[in-house]
């Protein structure tokens, strides 16, 4: 929703990337989520305290908590698929199917399942499957930029949605864009930060 995009990064970043969003289910029910890109965990009490403070800033004080949940999502480009064999094939999060830049797993998994089925139908060895497409490299550079941003990474997210049609951004995150569309997205943010990360990877032979 508009509120999700506009307000998500208004919270204190605390030298990380932290954002809050409200996903309404009806006129009086909603999911309120506090998310961090972090290399360390925080106490549950801090999560709840930050959510309460956020709601108070929005003048939301009369509410009932119906349920609570939490989760940890590995945001990594580690090539789990390189450990696969023709008879042993990891899937889901264990197989590296969680999209590194967003944490999306379900949509990503459906696409990868289609690829696996195609290999099986053609009797091709599963060990030959590699998920290193251009989007994998985009995610790799994106994570580099986030790690090196020292708390300013939220600007990358904000610029993406502020300077582009949200539909195109979600299409990009679903890995359905053309290279031409991707180029226009890259040029809408501080592209030099990604270029520097790319050259650093090339110089270190780590790409």
Language model regions located:
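C-terminal helical "tail/cap" subdomain of flavin- and related membrane-associated enzymes
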Residues: 114-207
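Short, surface-exposed coil-to-beta transition loops
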Residues: 16-19
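FAD/FMN-dependent oxidoreductases across multiple families
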Residues: 12-14, 38-115
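A short, hydrophobic, proline-anchored segment that marks a local hinge/packing element in signaling
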Residues: 23-26
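Hydrophobic residues embedded in beta-strands of well-ordered beta-sheets
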Residues: 29-30
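Short, small-residue-biased leader/transition segments that mark boundaries at the very start
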Residues: 2-5
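A basic- and aromatic-enriched beta-loop-alpha substructure that forms the phosphate/nucleotide-
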Residues: 33
């Amino acid at each position: 929703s508009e509120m999700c995009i506009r307000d998500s990064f208004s919270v204190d970043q605390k030298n990380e990337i932290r954002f809050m969003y409200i996903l309404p289910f009806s006129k009086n029910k909603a999911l309120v989520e506090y998310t961090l890109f972090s290399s360390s965990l925080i106490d549950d009490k801090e999560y709840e305290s930050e959510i309460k403070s956020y709601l108070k800033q929005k003048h939301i004080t009369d509410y009932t908590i119906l349920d609570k949940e939490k989760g940890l999502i590995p945001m990594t480009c580690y090539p789990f698929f390189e450990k696969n064999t023709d008879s042993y094939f990891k899937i889901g999060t264990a197989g590296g199917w969680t999209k590194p830049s967003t944490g999306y797993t379900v949509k990503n998994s459906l696409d990868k399942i289609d690829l696996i089925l195609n290999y099986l139908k053609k009797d091709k060895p599963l060990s030959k499957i590699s998920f290193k497409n251009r989007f994998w490299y985009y995610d790799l550079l994106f994570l580099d930029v986030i790690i090196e941003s020292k708390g300013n990474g939220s600007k990358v997210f904000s610029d993406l949605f502020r300077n582009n049609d949200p539909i195109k951004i979600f299409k990009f995150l679903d890995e359905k864009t053309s290279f031409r569309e991707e180029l226009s997205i890259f040029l809408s943010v501080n592209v030099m930060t990604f270029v520097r990360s790319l050259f650093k990877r090339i110089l270190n032979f780590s790409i």
